[in-house]
Amino acid sequence: MSAVSREGDDWILRLYIQPKASRDLIIGLHGDELKVAITAPPVDGQANAHLLKFIAKQFRVAKSRITLEKGELGRHKQLRISQPQQIPDAVAAALG
């Protein structure tokens, strides 16, 4: 499975998360995943909450339209985004 795929109006992102980074950024492809740096530490769900907020802002959707499907406790995650209003350049490039 590739880093970015589509199922109807939903986008599926396979992510590799780098917590405690200096800034929030979608870095680009990292193997078969998209690497995303976030400033939040991986403690008590802070990184997941921050990731969802950051991705929601990047795709211009409500946080409620993003589902963390896999990887709640690890760096490798899978997100489903329902009907994004905007596609960030790094994500569009990964889609090909």
From Swiss-Prot:
InterPro entries: DUF167 (IPR003746), YggU-like_sf (IPR036591). It comes from the Bacteria. Gene3D superfamilies: YggU-like. Pfam families: DUF167. GO terms for cellular component: cytoplasm. SMART domains: DUF167 (SM01152). Belongs to the UPF0235 family. This is UPF0235 protein NT01EI_0281.
